[in-house]
Every structure is written in structure tokens, then in C-alpha cells.
Amino acid sequence: MDASPKYTGVRKRKWGKWVAEIRLPNSRDRIWLGSFDSAEKAARAFDAALYCLRGPGARFNFPDNPPEIPGGRSLTPQQIQVVASRFACEEELLPPEQHHPSPPRGDHNTEEEVIISARGEINSGSGGPTLGQVGEDNNNEGNSNDTSSYWPLIWEEENFVGPPNSDHEFGFFTDDSTNLYFPTQQQQQHQLSSDFYYDGACEDDFSHYNINLWNF
């Protein structure tokens, strides 16, 4: 009696090899997936082909370790045959927790330290560009479409993977943005000059009013 496991889409040949094939949806045509030296490899080839035809919600031979094939739903039968055979031979059958390992703790701490360091540089003004300088660079760029040159911190925020709520370390939320704004020297001079001309205009208006007052 054969005690080998039974998998969907898998058959054993008389000479000991395991073969896999899958039928196309709403058709009698089948896709030959190949011949393998173990039932598990043949079953994984079937799962890969099933993913391409039915999607991630199909009933796989290994539901705890389903395949993930980018763009699999748009492949032709010939491409499915190649992808399924390659997936069965290259992908080892691992438990789910080993299939998607978590990042080492040391790297996690290093990334967190980099974020804290970046925030300190923004607050002290000794490191990268302040938000005022970033805005000034934005005006100087004109109609340039390359935003990575004057928005480096936004780029790091979108690409960083870190602990929960790590975005707050960058201070780009509405509640924290006012605490990180530093006016540039040009903006300060512009504000002082605006106040000067405003006071001058007021003095001229009052002096003119006084002259007309005594001019009966």
C-alpha cells in the first residue's frame, strides 16, 4: 500500500517520478508542469500554477505556505509552466515563521538611532538643511520635476521602515511643524524691511496731515 501523501494535481509514475499538471479554468486543456523527484516539489509546482490561474484565495496543497508570484495572474500557459517548475525547484518548504524572518534587533536599533540623530540635527540647525532652507531651495528650483534634491527628509520618511509611530521623529505633522521652522536670513531681512517701510509710510501720512492741519 502506498503511504506517500496525496496532493492535488500530482501523480506518481511507475518509474518513481512525480508529475504535476493543472487544468485551465472552464476548459478541458491542461498545463503540463513537469516531472519531479518528490511529491512535495510536484505539489508546489501545482500551487504556483494554481496561484497564477485562481489567485491567492485558491485552495493550495500547502495553505500555510502559499506561493507569492508577482504578476502571476497575467502570465500565459507557457509562462505558467516555466514559473511553476522554477518555483518548485528553487523554493524550499519552510515553516511560515522562517519564510518571512523578522529583521535583527541590532539593525532595528541602528535605524532608530539614525532617526533620532536626524531630528537633533534639524532642531539644532547644525546638520542638514532646515525647513526654511528647504523651502528656499524649492523656490530656486523653478519648474524642476526632481523633488529628491530639495526634499531629502520626505524621501527618507517614505522609504524608512522602522518602529510604530516612527514618522513623528521627522516632525512633518501639523502639530509639530511650527516647532521646526527656522526663517532664513533673507526672510528676516525682508520682514525688517517691510516693517521699516510701513513705519515710514505712517510717519509720512501723519506729517502730511499735520501740515494740512495748520494750513488754513
From Swiss-Prot:
The encoding gene: ERF016
Instruction: Specify the DNA-binding region ranges.
Output: 6-63
Q: What is this protein called?
A: Ethylene-responsive transcription factor ERF016
Q: Where is this region: Disordered?
A: 121-145
- Name the species this protein comes from: Arabidopsis thaliana
Q: Where in the cell is it found?
A: Nucleus
InterPro entries the record matches: AP2/ERF_dom, AP2/ERF_dom_sf, AP2/ERF_TF_ERF_subfamily, DNA-bd_dom_sf
The GO molecular function terms of this record are: DNA binding; DNA-binding transcription factor activity
Record-level GO cellular component terms: nucleus
